[in-house]
Curated annotation (Swiss-Prot):
NAD among keywords: no
Originating species: Bacillus licheniformis (strain ATCC 14580 / DSM 13 / JCM 2505 / CCUG 7422 / NBRC 12200 / NCIMB 9375 / NCTC 10341 / NRRL NRS-1264 / Gibson 46)
Location of the protein in the cell: Cytoplasm
Family to which this protein belongs: Belongs to the TACO1 family.
Region (Disordered): 1-21
Keyword entries, A-Z: Cytoplasm, DNA-binding, Transcription, Transcription regulation
NCBIfam families on file: PRK00110.1, PRK12378.1, YebC/PmpR family DNA-binding transcriptional regulator
Gene Ontology MF terms in the entry: DNA binding
Name assigned to this protein: Probable transcriptional regulatory protein BLi02909/BL01150
One GO CC annotation: cytosol
Main localisation: cytoplasm
Comp. bias (Basic residues): 1-14
Length: 240
C-alpha cells in the first residue's frame, strides 16, 4: 500500500504553520460538533466521536477545544446543519483526487472545489470517477525509535490483534486494518503498551501514480488550495 506517503501527509498536517493550524483546529471542531450532535456527546457510546477525537489529538488540538466543540453540540437544539459530501476529480496529468467536505451550503462548496480544480490543472469529475481506485482502511503508525522489538515478532503481534497488513521501514511500523477491525486493533496495540503516532480511518489508493518533482509540486499546490477551503476536511490522492 506504500503507506509512507500517508505518513508524510499526516506529518504535514501536524507541522502546519500557526495560521494554518488554527484552520485545521476549526475543521476538526466542526467534525467533532457533527459527530457529537448526531451520535451523542459520550465517546464511549459514540464510535464516530471517538475516531474524530483521536484524529484531533493526533493533530495536537488542545483538549479545551475538543471539549468546547462537544459542549456546543450538546447544548445546541438548532445550530448549523452540516452535510458530508465527497467530490471526485482529476489533478494535473490525471492523478486521482478525492475531496471530503462538511458543508452547510452545497452550492458554495461545489463552486469553490470546482474552481480550485480548474485553476490548478485539474477538473472536477462525476461521483465514482476515481473512488474505485481507493479503499477505506484503518491506518495506525508506530514510530520505531526506542522500540525494542524485531519485525517478525511485531508482525505476529499485529496479526494476532487482527490487522490486515503491516508495512515496515527504518523509522515506522504502518498497520492497515479493515474499518470494522480498526478499533479492536488499536485497543489491542495500546493495551500491549505501544504508543501510537497516529490512528485514523482513511482512504488508501490501491496503487500509487509515479510522478516527477515538477508534477509533485503541481499536485501539492492543488492540495494546498483545496485544504485552504473551510468546507474541505480531507484531500486524498494517489500520488506518493
Amino acid at each position: 500500500m506504500a503507506g509512507h506517503s500517508k505518513w508524510k501527509n499526516i506529518q504535514r498536517r501536524k507541522n502546519a504553520q500557526d495560521a494554518k493550524r488554527g484552520k485545521i483546529f476549526m475543521k476538526l471542531a466542526k467534525e467533532i460538533y457533527v459527530a457529537a450532535k448526531e451520535g451523542g456527546p459520550d465517546p464511549e457510546s459514540n464510535a464516530s466521536l471517538r475516531l474524530v477525537i483521536d484524529k484531533a489529538k493526533n493533530a495536537n488540538m488542545p483538549n479545551d477545544n475538543i471539549d468546547r466543540a462537544i459542549k456546543k453540540a450538546s447544548g445546541s437544539q438548532d445550530g448549523k446543519s452540516y452535510e458530508e459530501i465527497t467530490y471526485e476529480g482529476y489533478g494535473p496529468s490525471g492523478v486521482a483526487v478525492m475531496v471530503k467536505c462538511l458543508t452547510d451550503n452545497k452550492n458554495r462548496t461545489a463552486t469553490s472545489v470546482r474552481t480550485a480544480f480548474s485553476k490548478n490543472g485539474g477538473s472536477l469529475g462525476e461521483t465514482g470517477c476515481v473512488s474505485y481506485m481507493f479503499d477505506r482502511k484503518g491506518y495506525i503508525a508506530i514510530e520505531r525509535e526506542d522500540l525494542e522489538i524485531d519485525e517478525e515478532e511485531f508482525m505476529l503481534e499485529v496479526i494476532d490483534a487482527g490487522a490486515e497488513e503491516l508495512e515496515t521501514s527504518e523509522e515506522l511500523f504502518e498497520i492497515y486494518t479493515e474499518p470494522e477491525q480498526f478499533e479492536e486493533v488499536k485497543k489491542s496495540l495500546e493495551e500491549r503498551g505501544y504508543k501510537l503516532a497516529t490512528s485514523e480511518i482513511t482512504m488508501v489508493p490501491q496503487t500509487y501514480a509515479e510522478v516527477d518533482e515538477a508534477l509533485q509540486e503541481k499536485v501539492e499546490k492543488l492540495i494546498d488550495v483545496l485544504e485552504d477551503d473551510d468546507d474541505v476536511q480531507e484531500v486524498y490522492t494517489n500520488v506518493h
